[in-house]
Amino acid sequence: MKPETFYNLLAEQNLPLSNQQKEQFERYFELLVEWNEKINLTAITDKEEVYLKHFYDSIAPILQGLIPNETIKLLDIGAGAGFPSLPMKILYPELDVTIIDSLNKRINFLQLLAQELDLNGVHFYHGRAEDFAQDKNFRAQYDFVTARAVARMQVLSELTIPYLKVGGKLLALKASNAPEELLEAKNALNLLFSKVEDNLSYALPNRDPRYITVVEKKKETPNKYPRKAGMPNKRPL
């Protein structure tokens, strides 16, 4: 996808980009490729592929009407090079975005990126999702949590649901639809007082299938969740 195609597709969906936003995406691409030489951020470095499979793919929650352009608090778990939250932040500057990542080198990249792109209302923290979720400054503080290809729902739900306010939503972006994954996660979702509200399917412009599972938090999460770092993965609920 050429940058011009990206701009035109957004304009067609009533999301025209300003020159500043176009420059932000361009600089994002340049820094991604530059830093990818030093640390492993992505296997995708071809410009047209980045615009399609990182930038366009990341803004799917906006294109699907799941996220409003308001000052809402969004947490991105395991964002890696900032996907999906930072492309959404460029598109919707009002979003208040927090990223937690377990690799400090990636956090360094994100801090520089935010500075270069002149993004305000972005916060980056180095550490494990399980640890921050027990901190009252993070627990039950967010309207949305996003996760793009991070873990199976059975594990992901324990890592993310505790961060949500009651009524808040987890948006899990995936490249494959696995109904059995949601069946597996049924017990975990019950224990975490949350429920699958929707399982959206759509296609990228190149016809690659994509899915967003929407999970709503119904009640406060029991204090014992999430368990200690590593446990959700080792012994899923």
Swiss-Prot record:
GO MF entry, a single one: rRNA (guanine-N7-)-methyltransferase activity
Gene3D superfamilies for the chain: Vaccinia Virus protein VP39
Keyword S-adenosyl-L-methionine on entry: yes
EC assignment: 2.1.1.-
Keyword Chloroplast: no
Pfam families noted in UniProt: GidB
Entry keywords, A to Z: Cytoplasm, Methyltransferase, rRNA processing, S-adenosyl-L-methionine, Transferase
Name of the featured protein: Ribosomal RNA small subunit methyltransferase G
